[in-house]
Every structure is written in structure tokens, then in C-alpha cells.
């Protein structure tokens, strides 16, 4: 009988450790804590060598964007979150690029350089802060699973807001690219002229494994814990 209790105790400890590790993996991969407002004199550019070459350009694009006239917009997601965006009008009735940023990014940081490109092409731009990022509500990032439903909601909003004849291009980078690609198998309205997807990932599993490697853990070992954490929490 004592052996049985020992075995049960060991199993319970192992189960608790698995749940704890899964929770920590969930926090690192999916959880997005409440975000303080960025000070008006600060530009949110990540640290790291990958950004140094482009830091000055990114800061200039962000400052130029802040100086541009815009209209703040918001929608309510399917699960009750307030999602926010900013609309930059090139001209009345111009085609609109509906733009989505990357993993743990912000519309200002990832997309500000794209607004000038839109204007050069005669397009307006609606920059979206994805759920769990910047000014939008939410504490969970789902690598496009929920975000692509938000994309469809923004698309419906744009058609209602700008008229049934508005022309729309869905644009995204990184996780935002995968977000817009995930809607490509839906019955999209004829308003959608096309999709611009820059460096999207091939699947949620692949990008999660990449995130695990960036955290310094073996992807094949960490992925089951991340997957379990997503299901539990």
C-alpha cells in the first residue's frame, strides 16, 4: 500500500511539473500583459542587432506618421474585445490597404513606413493594432487563429464605414501576413482586390517552434508544453 501511495505521489508531482512548465511556456509564447501607453516623446523600437541598421529610418517613419492627420477607429471582436486602428486618408474614395503588424508588434512600429508607400500608390491606409498588442484589448496572442477572425471583422467594418464600392487590399507582415493569408480561403467580398503578405509563416506550429528556439529552448522538446499550455490556459 505504501508503494502505491509513493507511485501516486510521484505521478502527481510529475503532473504538477508538466502543468507548471506548460503554464510558463504559455506565458512566454502567448500571453501579453496589459500594456502601458507609450509616452508621446518615445518611439517603440526593439533592442537588438537586427534593428540597429534600420533604427533611424523606423524612428523617422514613426514620427512622420504621428504628424499625419488620421482618424481613430475601433471595432468589437467576436469575443468582446475592443480592437483599435488608425485611418490615414490619401483621398476620398481611394482604395484602402487594411494593414496588420507582426508578433508582439504595433501598427506604428511595423507599418508606419508602409503608409508613405500607400500614398505613393494612391491608396489610403487603415493600420490595425492586433489583439493583445499596443492600444487594442486582449491578453492572448494566437498566431493568427483568432486574429484572422478579427481581420474579417475589420473588413466588414471598412465596407460599412466607407461604402459598398470601396476597394480593399489586405496587407500584413510576419504574423500579420499569416493573418491575412488565413482569410484567403474564406468567401471574401468582391471589394478585396488582393492580399500583400510579407514574410508570413507556413503554419502556426512552425512559427511557435521558431519562437521557442528564440527563447533558447529546443523546439521539439518545448513545443508539446506550449501546445498543452495553449489548451489549458
Range-by-range predicted roles:
Residues 78-89:
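A short loop-to-beta-strand scaffold at the N-terminal edge of the catalytic core in hydrolase folds
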Residues 94-102:
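Short beta-strand element of the alpha/beta-hydrolase
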Residues 118-137:
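Conserved alpha/beta-hydrolase
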Residues 141-162:
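Alpha/beta-hydrolase active-site loop
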Residues 162-174:
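Alpha/beta-hydrolase fold nucleophile elbow
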Residues 182-233:
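Hydrolase active-site cap/lid region
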